[in-house]
Amino acid sequence: MNTITHEEANTVQPPLFFTDSAASKVKELIEEEANQALKLRVFVSGGGCSGFQYGFTFDEIINEDDFVIEKQGVRLLVDSMSVQYLLGAEIDYQENAQGAQFVIKNPAAASTCGCGSSFSV
């Protein structure tokens, strides 16, 4: 397990970034579930209209190969296979006229689909 806290992000380059907005929303969702053991897992899998797709789920388990990014007391988990597709990406939470959703801004994505949940490299 590789853990990077928000404080360490100033000295250690985290594999991806977790915005204040995303951390706040995850914290709110965890409080609604009344389970402080939950962490947000972000992963990449094959599929979608562009070849790869992003996924989000809550998980209580931190696997040995997980990268852990901690911010505002919230932990974001990324497995070692997915992290290679997410290097330098930003996980954000946005609310606008179309609704509210977690958004990944990924500099490694050569193209993305219109929905923003799948990409190609």
From Swiss-Prot:
GO terms for molecular function: 2 iron, 2 sulfur cluster binding; 4 iron, 4 sulfur cluster binding; iron ion binding. Keywords: Iron, Iron-sulfur, Metal-binding. It comes from the Bacteria. Required for insertion of 4Fe-4S clusters. Belongs to the HesB/IscA family. Homodimer. This is Putative iron-sulfur cluster insertion protein ErpA. It comes from Nitrosomonas eutropha (strain DSM 101675 / C91 / Nm57).
